[in-house]
């Protein structure tokens, strides 16, 4: 007799393993981007890829499904990067993958290259910094009362000095600066640079 077989039905492995959920960028610096995602209970681990040189390249593969964070280092400042993550499950020597989830992240704009402080008198200190061509202006903050408080915001990137007055004599003060760039309704900030200055006794 003759046996008739039906056509094969192909089941994609990815349909059996759900895509990674809540994938997002959680923190950025001028050279790092940290990616995080939710745990996939059915996965063995996760594969993280970066788009570079015109193609996708695997930059990390976790060995378990409890590692839910990865920091990509060595990046250029003020640059947008594309990443994608997928879960994988290995069983019986066979590895199945979920669909990809894509994420984009942008590194921070650079900060000023130099930030210094000097005592002017018993009640004032002068802060100086180098020009940042990528900035619209700068925000200067002082640490007082247990927290950082903005004490000046420049309206341009050519103002490169600020004198802080009304200070106590012979006292050390902490200051920090960050660059900002305004484009339309969007404002981007750099990381901080800090300095400690003591007034004249």
Q: What would you call each of these model-derived segments?
A:
Residues 1-3, 72-91, 164-184:
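Beta-strand-rich modules
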Residues 3-41, 77, 94-134, 169, ...:
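Pro/Thr/Ser/Gly-rich low-complexity, intrinsically disordered linker/stalk tracts
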Residues 40-60, 67, 84, 100, ...:
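Extracellular low-complexity, O-glycosylation-prone stalks/linkers
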Residues 1-2, 52-55, 91-93, 144-147, ...:
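Solvent-exposed strand-loop boundary residues in beta-sheet-rich modules
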Residues 66-70, 90, 158-162, 182, ...:
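Repeated polar recognition positions within modular binding domains
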Residues 20, 37, 48, 72, ...:
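An aromatic-rich alpha-helical recognition segment common to small helix-rich domains
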Residues 34, 50-51, 60, 72-73, ...:
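Short, surface-exposed linear motifs at loops/turns and structural transition points
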């Amino acid at each position: 007799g003759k046996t008739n077989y039906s056509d094969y039905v192909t089941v994609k492995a990815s349909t059996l393993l759900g895509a990674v959920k809540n994938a997002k960028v959680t923190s950025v610096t001028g050279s790092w981007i940290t990616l995080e995602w939710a745990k996939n209970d059915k996965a063995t681990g996760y594969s993280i890829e970066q788009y570079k040189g015109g193609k996708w390249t695997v930059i990390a593969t976790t060995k378990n499904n409890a590692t839910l964070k990865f920091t990509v280092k060595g990046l250029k400042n003020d640059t947008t990067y594309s990443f994608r993550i997928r879960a994988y499950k290995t069983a019986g020597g066979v590895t199945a993958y979920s669909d990809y989830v894509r994420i984009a992240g942008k590194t921070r704009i650079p900060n000023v290259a130099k930030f210094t402080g000097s005592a002017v008198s018993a009640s004032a200190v002068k802060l100086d910094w180098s020009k940042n061509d990528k900035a619209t202006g700068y925000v200067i903050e002082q640490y007082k009362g247990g927290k950082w408080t903005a004490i000046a915001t420049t309206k341009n990137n050519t103002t490169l000095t600020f004198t802080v007055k009304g200070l106590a004599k012979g006292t050390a003060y902490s200051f920090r600066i960050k660059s900002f760039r305004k484009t339309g309704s969007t404002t981007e900030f750099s990381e901080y640079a800090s300095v400690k200055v003591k007034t004249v006794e």
